[in-house]
Amino acid sequence: MKYSNIQFIELSPNSPLLINKKNITFDCENVFLPVGSETKDIICVGNNGKNEIKVQFTSKEQNDKFLLRVQPPLVALEGGYACEFEIFIQPLCTCKIEEKLSVIGFDMKEGKEIIETVTIKTETEMTTKIDPDELVQEKKIGEGTFGIVYLGIFRGNKVAIKRMKDIQDDEDALIEFEKEIFMLDKFRCDYIIHFYGAVFIPNKICMVTEYAEFGSLQDMMKKEKNIQIRLFMKIKILIDAAKGISYLHSNGILHRDIKPDNILVLSIDESSKVNGKLTDFGSSRNINMMMTNMTFTKGIGTPTYMAPEILQQQKYKKTADIYSFGITMYETFHWGECYPKLLFKFPWAIADFINKGQRRERPDNIPEPIYKLITLCWAQEPKERLPIDSIIEKLESFLQSC
């Protein structure tokens, strides 16, 4: 040590162990740590005593938010000598890290243990991998086959926290979840619900999105049964949802689960730029679950929004999304179910009706031109259905005449 230009400091009075710094920062003053990959820092430990000391670093307990390893794991230091230790950290989420790291020495001659501490003090870059401690869960606002949705707060914003059911025990579901998160992270569209991020830590897995004050279009239909939402607002919400579908389709993505339940209403103010937003896209796992049970007897779902070609187990294409949007338009303008239980007692009756090429007739509360547009969306032949941008044009012309 006496030939080194490294400045050593005492860890505590009378301790034979010296160190070059008490805080391990990974150069955090200049660079935020990347999430999901390792960053290295170096710390020097010296033996200022006469006896040989075995030195190692240990953390008190396993941490959910980062992985830590030290190289070399153990060194025998003779008196007057020092050694470099490499500290590697891999953050698993966006977080600030302040953690005590024990420096444990064992005097071989005297059989005495020396315990000192240094501090890891660093911060990561901002990512969509969320620190669960930043989420404040307030109250339950919904539940489905996927899990439970809570209202919460994340960095001062009202958010929806979707906690997944038993996902950590299902490897396929976890892979599907990660794929969906990867896709959501890339979306930049005003008409798709804003994605803040997700928690990947086992037993805390959840997705965090923008909170929609009015819930889904489906929620509004149930709650506002006796309050008629103006035709203008119905058209506007559907235009917004169609713009979300257009964004997905132009990027080669299929929604696969378009229905009033997956259109969220953020505002019913007619002057708002955006009133409705799409959510729950790419839910191929929902489709797969339904396809394995085409008789619809186990309560997994109904074929209400499924195009005839999907019921016949053909490949899913953009036109199947258009069909689903046609049924969604029917229910929105009618402000009720397309296939009420009174007329369709069993889910297979709906599938049978659709496969025969039959469709619901125009109810009195759907104007003729709008019903004509709906029929162009739910045509039996996929190639006869309108592309989404043509639907937007027609809806916008209806809006102008309101």
Task: Cite the ranges covered by each PLM segment.
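Protein kinase glycine-rich loop
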Residues: 138-149
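Regulatory alphaC helix of protein kinase catalytic domains
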Residues: 177-182
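A short, aromatic-enriched beta-strand patch in the conserved N-lobe beta-sheet
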Residues: 197-198
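Conserved short submotifs of the Hanks-type protein kinase catalytic core
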Residues: 202-216, 220
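Activation segment signature within eukaryotic-like protein kinase domains
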Residues: 237-238
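Conserved activation segment of eukaryotic-like protein kinases, specifically the C-terminal portion
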Residues: 295-309
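Conserved catalytic-loop aspartate of Hanks-type protein kinases
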Residues: 321
